[in-house]
Amino acid sequence: MQTIFAQATARGKAGVAIIRISGPDAFEVGRCLLGSLPDAGRFALRDVRTPLGELLDRGLVLVFKAPASFTGEDTVELQLHGSVAVVRAVEGAIRSTGLARLADAGEFTQRALLNDMLDLTQVEGLGRLIDSETEAQRKVAQASFEGGLSDKAERWRHLMIRAAALLEASIDFVDEDVPVDVVPEVQSILMGLDTDLAKEVTGAVVAERLHDGFEVAILGAPNAGKSTLLNVLADREIAITSDVPGTTRDVIEARLDVSGLPVTFLDTAGIRDTVDVIEKIGVQRAIDRALAADVRILLEIDDWILPDVLSDTIDFRYRAKADLSDGEGISGRTGVGIDRLLTDIEGVLSEKMSAVRSAVTDRQRGGIEAARVSLDAGVTVLSGTAELELAAEHIRHAQRSLDSVIGRVDVENLLGEIFSRFCIGK
């Protein structure tokens, strides 16, 4: 395997830049540039020179001996001054040794996977951790990166192996006097697994919303103050406000951090019967987005009736334009009621978040759901004809589905897509 190198910190001018070198010739590359290396696990200040002796920079050098490194390979890290020119010169010097090439996107992490330093769920958790923008996203992604889903998957896998082994033993000794009926125990194992997997799937749906951002739809009649409220929440003018009803035609979005949760507020068209074709399209879009949203808030005004299709979906109702009435309700102009609004939204979303255990991706959820389908089929067989061979085959199918989640089998075609989302130095 070739030795690779890349800048591990962001490109551009900065205080410090880190260049990582990993692979069988990493130490030799380091000696070409530094003369000598500190002992593994130690750091030292060194002059960085070209193979011909030209001084390029002076910085800290860290050495990691395989397998005690991120990639599981011999690794050298150079902490340099973050000048674009310095980084370019040092990378050129590394390349000139002929011992290393520039890494592909995500190649360091890919090597960590291939060297069993990480499994596939941890790799995907790392990707989510890098992408995290809010505290809730960070915590959930960190749980995946630390192996939260991996540990559960291993436990489920061992239970499946035990259930299949019990059935196989009964099949092998079918003509002998086997004193114990294993079917009740196997059924108990499978039903317990089904409960665990169902909880994980439920949490996965919310985890995906956490990654993409929860949606909160602001609904109401035309000129109810929805756009004004959105502008106040976003702390900038992103929606046009006017006394003319029907100003908002399309859905306007503002992404915010609400107590560590990523939330996209949706300013929707005022809902009313209209003969205006364009406004009618806007009203339908408002209804469609509201039905798909995680939370729906309604700004109420007198003499206006919410359409039946939305009447049972509203999470919170607030009196609109409180600045023009007795002060009860909510007002985008004065800020009355906005703290209560945010607290209400946080409460609903925090309750949804209680089902999330780790940053489960769509791919992982698909594998878990497939495993659950196979387990349910096994339970059905055992409850009916009790054909042990068929039930055992369903369990083996479930195990293969679970193995694909953590990267034991059938993942080669996924690696290119997964690692292409990483930066060059990761």
From Swiss-Prot:
One of its GO terms (molecular function) is metal ion binding. It comes from the Bacteria. It comes from Jannaschia sp. (strain CCS1). Belongs to the TRAFAC class TrmE-Era-EngA-EngB-Septin-like GTPase superfamily. TrmE GTPase family. It is found in: Cytoplasm. HAMAP family: GTPase_MnmE. Binds 1 potassium ion per subunit. Residues 213-350 form the TrmE-type G domain. This is tRNA modification GTPase MnmE. The gene is mnmE.
